[in-house]
């Protein structure tokens, strides 16, 4: 995955999670999230998305209040749905936020 390090500027949250912003225009963002295999269970805080959220699990596994999503899963969260995602194993997720993120 050398391309990740060469082409992405990462923001490290210090919780085992880092974010790489691929695109942003106004409130719309396309980002990569990478979580270590040893990430703390509360590394992602409860949040919602005014315009919904779509994500593709590229590696690892994500789970939240609504289900478990292994690598290859495409997930859509409806507008204003609040969730608290967790990860299992080293995880890489491609995420689209049409209208940003809101803390719950």
Would you name each region that the model predicts?
Residues 21, 32-33, 42-49, 65-67, ...:
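Short histidine-centered beta-strand/loop micro-motifs
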Residues 39-64, 71:
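Glycine- and acidic-residue-biased ligand/ion/polar-headgroup-sensing regions
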Residues 1-29:
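A short, N-terminal "cap"/entry segment at the start of jelly-roll beta-barrel domains
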Residues 73-74, 82:
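Residue-level marker of beta-strand positions
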Residues 27-29, 36-41, 100-101:
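Short, charged/polar surface micro-motifs in flexible loops or helix N-caps
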Residues 19-21, 30-34, 54, 74-76:
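Conserved hydrophobic/aromatic beta-strand scaffold that supports enzyme active sites
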Residues 68, 79-104:
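Ligand-binding loop in jelly-roll beta-barrel domains
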């Amino acid at each position: 995955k050398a391309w990740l390090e060469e082409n992405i500027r990462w923001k490290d949250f210090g919780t085992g999670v880092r974010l790489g912003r691929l695109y942003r225009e106004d409130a719309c963002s396309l980002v990569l999230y990478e979580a270590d295999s040893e990430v703390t269970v509360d590394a992602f805080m409860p949040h919602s998305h005014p315009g919904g959220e779509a994500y593709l699990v590229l590696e690892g596994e994500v789970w939240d209040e609504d289900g478990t999503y292994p690598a290859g899963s495409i997930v859509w969260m409806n507008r204003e749905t609040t969730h608290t995602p967790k990860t299992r194993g080293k995880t890489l997720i491609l995420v689209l936020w049409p209208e940003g993120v809101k803390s719950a």
